[in-house]
């Protein structure tokens, strides 16, 4: 049964871990296709909503802990603009109030998930910078 979405979803920016403050929410990650009754490993991570990222990026540490298998390779560039060959992993992201997504993601040395436009484009995202809150509809 699909999870019921609770929209609109509103949260304050994370002012403790990001300077300047940024739109961050919690996400759970697991192996795609895992049945809920199978006691699968689910890891939680902060997730920065990053409209500058084409695709979602997950921490390498989570790739290792979930033992995700790579499904493809692409050439990707970070903010430095230097292209490099990188693996793509299939992963399930679970947003408690907004639904579940199985996506193709790349890994990085960050300690948090970067939610890219591959997911953000499924929502209407409003950044209220002056109020330091964000809303998803």
Where are these regions (language model features)?
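Pepsin/retropepsin-fold aspartyl endopeptidases
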Residues: 1-137
């Amino acid at each position: 049964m699909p999870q019921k979405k609770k929209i609109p979803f509103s949260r304050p920016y994370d002012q403790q871990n990001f300077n300047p403050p940024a739109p961050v929410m919690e996400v759970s990650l697991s192996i795609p296709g895992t049945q809920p009754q199978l006691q699968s490993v689910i890891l939680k991570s902060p997730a920065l909503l990053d409209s500058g990222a084409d695709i979602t990026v997950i921490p390498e540490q989570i790739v290792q802990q979930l033992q995700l298998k790579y499904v493809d390779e692409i050439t990707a560039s970070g903010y430095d603009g230097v292209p490099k060959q990188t693996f793509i992993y299939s992963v399930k992201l679970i947003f408690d109030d907004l639904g579940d997504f199985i996506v193709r993601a790349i890994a990085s040395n960050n300690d948090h998930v970067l939610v890219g436009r591959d997911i953000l484009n499924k929502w209407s995202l409003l950044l209220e910078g002056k109020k330091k809150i964000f809303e998803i509809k």
